[in-house]
């Protein structure tokens, strides 16, 4: 299979496939006599794993670990589960952080009159100005 066939089968761009090869995340494809890359079903599996792992938030280094587990016939599913649950915990923390940011922004917006005046509690609070009418804590 050539790179455009692999791109179609995996949902990745040719550029992304070459990037993953450059980062040594996939098994290097064999080169044909004319220098073109030749891919196998194993490459499709590796690249599909990479695409889907990236879609759910795994970093490139975490993907490297998942690929090592994928290639290890003696792997333990407990290792894969542990990596997955660790990623879930990171995502939950990120969600909590985003919710706190959202609540702070809503509180700032509530204090702002939103009129034609120049005084803006949002700007004052974000800038840490002491003359802000906002009593919201700075973070």
Swiss-Prot record:
Q: Which species? A: Yersinia pestis
- PROSITE patterns from the UniProt entry: HTH_MERR_2
| Residues involved in Cu(+) binding | 112, 120
Q: Name one GO molecular function term.
A: DNA-binding transcription factor activity
Chief place where the protein resides: cytoplasm
Question: What cellular component GO annotations does this protein have?
Answer: cytoplasm
Name of the molecule in the record: HTH-type transcriptional regulator CueR
| Coiled-coil stretches noted in the UniProt entry, renumbered to this chain | none
In its UniProt record, which GO terms are filed under biological process? positive regulation of DNA-templated transcription
Q: Transcription regulation: is it a keyword of this entry?
A: yes
Q: What is the lineage of its organism?
A: Bacteria, Pseudomonadati, Pseudomonadota, Gammaproteobacteria, Enterobacterales
Query: Which PANTHER family does this one have?
Result: HTH-TYPE TRANSCRIPTIONAL REGULATOR CUER (PTHR30204:SF16), REDOX-CYCLING DRUG-SENSING TRANSCRIPTIONAL ACTIVATOR SOXR (PTHR30204)
Listed under subunit, the entry gives:
Homodimer.
Q: Where in the cell is it found?
A: Cytoplasm
Known DNA-binding region: 4-23
């Amino acid at each position: 299979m050539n790179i455009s066939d692999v791109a179609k089968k995996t949902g990745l761009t040719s550029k992304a496939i070459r990037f993953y090869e450059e980062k040594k995340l996939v098994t290097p494809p064999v080169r044909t006599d004319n220098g073109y890359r030749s891919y196998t079903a194993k490459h499709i599996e590796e690249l599909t794993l990479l695409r889907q792992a990236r879609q759910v938030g795994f970093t490139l280094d975490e993907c490297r670990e998942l690929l090592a587990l994928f290639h290890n016939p003696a792997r333990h599913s407990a290792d894969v589960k542990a990596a997955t649950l660790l990623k879930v915990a990171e995502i939950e923390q990120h969600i909590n952080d985003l919710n706190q940011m959202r609540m702070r922004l809503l509180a700032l917006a509530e204090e702002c009159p939103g009129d034609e005046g120049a005084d803006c509690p949002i700007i004052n609070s974000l800038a840490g100005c002491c003359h802000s009418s906002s009593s919201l804590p700075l973070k």
